[in-house]
A protein has these predicted regions:
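Short coil/linker segments at helix-helix boundaries
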Residues: 31-37, 42-48, 56-67, 78, ...
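TPR alpha-solenoid repeat register
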Residues: 82, 131, 179, 233, ...
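Bacterial Sec-dependent N-terminal signal peptides
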Residues: 1-33, 37-40
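Amphipathic alpha-helical segments of tetratricopeptide repeats
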Residues: 74, 115-116, 163-167, 217, ...
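Alpha-helical linker/edge segments of TPR/alpha-solenoid repeat scaffolds
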Residues: 92-103, 190-198, 246-249, 280-286, ...
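Residue at a conserved register position within TPR or TPR-like alpha-solenoid repeats
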Residues: 56, 90, 139, 146, ...
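Residue-level detector of the short coil/turn that links helix A to helix B
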Residues: 60, 143, 150, 210, ...
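Short coil turns that delineate tetratricopeptide repeat
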Residues: 77, 126, 173-175, 227-228, ...
Length: 409
C-alpha cells in the first residue's frame, strides 16, 4: 500500500468535510435561495438523491453519479455543493492509481469553483457554518492531491486553510459525530506521519499535536455508531488496520466494503489482499482471478495497480501451495509487467516477484538465472526492505552451490 506522505493532514479534514456535507444538506426556499435559518438534515428529497449519487460514485458508476450532481448544479448554480460533488467524482477516478494525473485538472477546477462559491456564501450569509464545510472540504482535497504530486508547499497551505475552516464548523454542536470523525483521523495521522517520515516534522509544526491511539478509538466509535460518517470511517480504518498489522480487522472491513461496493477496484483489491494475508487462500485466489478478469474486460478503474496485487497473490499461491511453478512464473511475470507499466519497480510486489522467480529458478537448478533475479532485487530494493538482505544472502548461497557442483564433476 502506498503511503502518501502528506496524506492525512489533508484527508483528515477532507473526510470530515465530505461526510458532513451529506449529513447537513440545507433547505432552500422556493426561489432557490438559501435560508440560513433552515440548516436541516430533514430535506429527504435532497438527502436521498445525494445519497444515491454518492453510492454510484463509490461503486465507480461515475456517469450515473455525475448526472445527479449536474442536476444539483442546474438547480443551485451559485451554491458550492454541486461543484464539490463533481470534484469528488473526479477524485474517485484518481483513487485506483494516484500516480495518474489524467483527472487532476478537472478535480482542481471543481474544487476551485467550490471555493469561489463557498467564499461568496460565507460573505453573504450570517451563518458561516455551511460555507465553512465546503471551504474546509475543497481545500482538503486540494491539499491531498498536491501531496500526491509532491507539491509540499501547496499541500501545506491548502491543509492549513482547511483546518481554519474546520474550526469554524465547531460552533454547530449537532455536528459532533462528524467532528469526532475528523478529530479521529487527525489524531492518528498527525502522530503517524513524523514517525514514518521524520523529514516532514518541520511542516507538521504548523499543526496541533495528535494522539494515534485516541484517533483509532474515535474512528471505531464513529464506524460503529454514526450514520452519515460510518462508511467513510470504515474506509480509513481499513488502511489504518493494515498499517497497524491488525489483519483480521482489516479483512472484515475490506470484505464489508467490497460487498457493499462490488465494482470499486480499490475496495476489491484490499479485500483480496487481506484475505491473502489472513490465510484465506481460496477466497484470495477467487478474488484475484476476478480482478484480472475485470482488467481484461476494461472495467472502470481496474488497471495495473490492482493487477499487481492480484497477479502476485496468484503467483504466490501457485508457487507455495500448488507447487505449480510454470503457472507461478506466469503470474510473477505478469506482476512485473504491471509494476513496470505503473512505474512501481520499487514496490513490494515487484521486488517479491523477482525473489519468487529467483527461488523457482534455484529450485529447478537454473542457478545462473536465479543469481540474475536475486541481483535485480539487490540492485532495486530499498535498503530498508528485508528482500534486499535476503537476496544478497541468496546470491552467496547459490554461488556456493555452483562451486559444489563444479567440484562434483
Amino acid at each position: 500500500m502506498k503511503k502518501n506522505i502528506f496524506f492525512v493532514v489533508a484527508s483528515t479534514l477532507l473526510l470530515f468535510s465530505t461526510t458532513s456535507i451529506f449529513a447537513q444538506l440545507w433547505d432552500f426556499s422556493s426561489e432557490g435561495k438559501l435560508d440560513p435559518k433552515n440548516m436541516l438534515i430533514m430535506n429527504n428529497a435532497i438527502q436521498t438523491d445525494a445519497g444515491k449519487a454518492v453510492n454510484h460514485m463509490y461503486n465507480f458508476k461515475f456517469d450515473e453519479a455525475e448526472r445527479e450532481y449536474r442536476w444539483f448544479k442546474y438547480k443551485y448554480p451559485t451554491h458550492p455543493m454541486p461543484y464539490f460533488l463533481l470534484g469528488l467524482n473526479e477524485w474517485w477516478k484518481i483513487v485506483p492509481n494516484t500516480d495518474n494525473p489524467m483527472y487532476d485538472d478537472r478535480c482542481l477546477a471543481y474544487m476551485d469553483s467550490t471555493i469561489l462559491y463557498a467564499e461568496r456564501l460565507y460573505d453573504d450569509s450570517d451563518n458561516k457554518v455551511e460555507a465553512s464545510f465546503f471551504l474546509s472540504a475543497a481545500y482538503a482535497f486540494k491539499g491531498r492531491l498536491y501531496s500526491e504530486r509532491k507539491k509540499w508547499v501547496k499541500a501545506a497551505s491548502a491543509g492549513k486553510s482547511a483546518l481554519k475552516y474546520l474550526e469554524k464548523c465547531r460552533s454547530y454542536t449537532d455536528l459532533s459525530p462528524e467532528l469526532q470523525f475528523g478529530d479521529g483521523l487527525y489524531n492518528y495521522y498527525v502522530e503517524w506521519i513524523p514517525k514514518e517520515y521524520p523529514m516532514l516534522k518541520p511542516i507538521l509544526w504548523l499543526f496541533p499535536d495528535g494522539n494515534k491511539e485516541k484517533g483509532i478509538k474515535d474512528l471505531e466509535k464513529v464506524a460503529n455508531n454514526a450514520f452519515y460518517t460510518r462508511m467513510e470511517a470504515r474506509y480509513f480504518l481499513l488502511q489504518i488496520y493494515g498499517m497497524e498489522k491488525q489483519n483480521e480487522k482489516a479483512y472484515q472491513l475490506a470484505k464489508y466494503m467490497h460487498d457493499n461496493f462490488p465494482d470499486n477496484p480499490y475496495f476489491h483489491r484490499y479485500y483480496a489482499r487481506n484475505a491473502f494475508l489472513n490465510g484465506r487462500g481460496l477466497e484470495a485466489e477467487a478474488e484475484a482471478k476476478s480482478i484480472l478478469a475485470r482488467i481484461d474486460h476494461h472495467m472502470v478503474g481496474y488497471e495495473g495497480v490492482s493487477g499487481r496485487y492480484a497477479a502476485y497473490i496468484l503467483a504466490y499461491i501457485n508457487q507455495n501451495y500448488y507447487r505449480n511453478f510454470e503457472v507461478a512464473k506466469m503470474y510473477y511475470n505478469q506482476t512485473i509487467g504491471f509494476a513496470i507499466a505503473t512505474n512501481a519497480k520499487q514496490s513490494g510486489y515487484h521486488i517479491s516477484s523477482l525473489m519468487g522467480l529467483g527461488k523457482i529458478a534455484q529450485t529447478e537448478g537454473q542457478l545462473d538465472e536465479a543469481i540474475s533475479f536475486y541481483k535485480q532485487v539487490a540492485d532495486i530494493a530499498d535498503k530498508k526492505m528485508p528482500q534486499r538482505d535476503e537476496a544478497k544472502k541468496a546470491i552467496e548461497e547459490v554461488k556456493k552451490l555452483k562451486k559444489q557442483q563444479k567440484k562434483g564433476k
